[in-house]
């Protein structure tokens, strides 16, 4: 592999040699029971031998029910300046305290999918998952030790994430379609025996996309949105007047599309219907915003879009 660009991500050109082999075998235990075995071996000229096995089991008790269990390991080499954009914002000094080791993980996932078809043509799909992931050598940005620094090091301990998620997919014969999902998780970092919550990570979230077609009016209405729970934010020490946790917040949009013409569609709508921005109720969102080149400028606290309510109009032309 060879990669170079004109950003700080590659101050010098990066060359990596990786030799890999991947094997996979599906075993049919019975008509409704399948096992998938997989293994990957890599040799990295910087990190040596890497072996990542995986196993998956699938059970179809009926044509409308599917159970899955997956377990395996992971391996990841982190590039701070392409993945951790906070390192390039604000006036905080970036401190790397050691030669960073690759992250490794162990995970298990349970999944259930249910499909229901009603006599009137309505389709209802339900999917739920539960998972657990354990990380070694995870690279965590430390905003707390020194408010003027972002300190990067491999976690001297472990990190874990335990969560559940669900999705509902509804399609009706009278023009209504809906996809609604949620995620609840419990992330935790343990450093030197001390447990903490990762910054900029919400414990629950939801999303939805609802469409209603009105053929006699040649009209389609789309309503989409996201909901986010509180997340811990990187404040500048005990004297920082900004809240340590974000509020519950939501971004919601609506769009109307007129489809009477063969190749043209007219559309318009409103983005951020609730006119929510993260600076509401906060003394100041960005530290030192009046002097973006000053020593106190810090944009790491920004956790959501800053654009308020706005409208839009457009024309869509279909060639084929």
Question: Which stretches of residues belong to each language-model region?
Answer:
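Transmembrane beta-strands of outer-membrane beta-barrel proteins
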Residues: 1, 35-37, 67-69, 108, ...
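Transmembrane beta-strands of outer-membrane beta-barrel pores
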Residues: 1-4, 17, 39-45, 59, ...
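Membrane-embedded beta-barrel scaffold of Gram-negative outer-membrane proteins
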Residues: 2, 60, 68, 101-154, ...
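Surface-exposed extracellular loop regions of Gram-negative outer-membrane beta-barrel proteins
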Residues: 12-44, 50-54, 168-186
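Residues on the lipid-exposed face of transmembrane beta-strands in outer-membrane beta-barrel proteins
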Residues: 21-27, 55-59, 110-114, 164-170, ...
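Outer-membrane beta-barrel strand-turn architecture
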Residues: 23, 27-31, 59-63, 104, ...
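Gram-negative outer-membrane beta-barrel transporters
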Residues: 28-32, 125-134, 154-235, 316-318
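C-terminal beta-signal and adjacent terminal beta-strands/loops
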Residues: 227-235, 258-320
């Amino acid at each position: 592999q060879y990669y170079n660009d004109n950003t700080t991500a590659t101050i010098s050109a990066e060359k990596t040699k990786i030799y890999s082999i991947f094997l996979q075998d599906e075993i049919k235990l019975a008509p409704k029971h399948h096992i998938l075995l997989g293994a990957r071996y890599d040799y990295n000229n910087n990190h040596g031998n890497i072996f990542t096995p995986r196993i998956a089991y699938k059970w179809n008790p009926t044509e409308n029910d599917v159970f899955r269990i997956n377990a395996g390991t992971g391996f990841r080499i982190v590039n701070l300046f392409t993945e951790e954009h906070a390192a390039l914002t604000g006036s905080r000094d970036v401190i790397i305290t050691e030669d960073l080791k690759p992250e490794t993980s162990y995970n298990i996932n349970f999944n259930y999918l249910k499909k229901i078809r009603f006599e009137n043509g309505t389709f209802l799909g339900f999917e739920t998952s539960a998972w657990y992931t354990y990380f070694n050598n995870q690279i965590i940005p430390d905003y707390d030790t020194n408010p003027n620094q972002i300190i990067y090091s491999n976690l001297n301990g472990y990190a874990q994430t335990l969560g559940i998620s669900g999705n509902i997919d509804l399609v009706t014969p009278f023009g209504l379609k809906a996809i609604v999902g949620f995620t609840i998780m419990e992330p935790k970092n343990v450093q030197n025996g001390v447990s903490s919550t990762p910054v900029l990570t919400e414990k629950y979230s939801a999303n939805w996309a609802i469409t209603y077609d009105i053929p006699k009016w040649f009209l389609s209405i789309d309503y989409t949105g996201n909901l986010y729970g509180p997340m811990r934010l990187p404040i500048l020490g005990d004297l920082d007047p900004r809240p340590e946790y974000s509020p519950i917040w939501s971004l919601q949009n609506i769009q109307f599309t007129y489809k009477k013409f063969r190749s043209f569609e007219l559309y318009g709508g409103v983005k951020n219907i609730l006119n929510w921005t993260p600076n509401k109720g906060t003394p100041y969102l960005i530290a030192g915003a009046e002097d973006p080149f000053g020593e106190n400028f810090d944009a790491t606290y920004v956790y959501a879009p800053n654009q308020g309510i706005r409208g839009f109009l457009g024309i869509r032309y279909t060639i084929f």
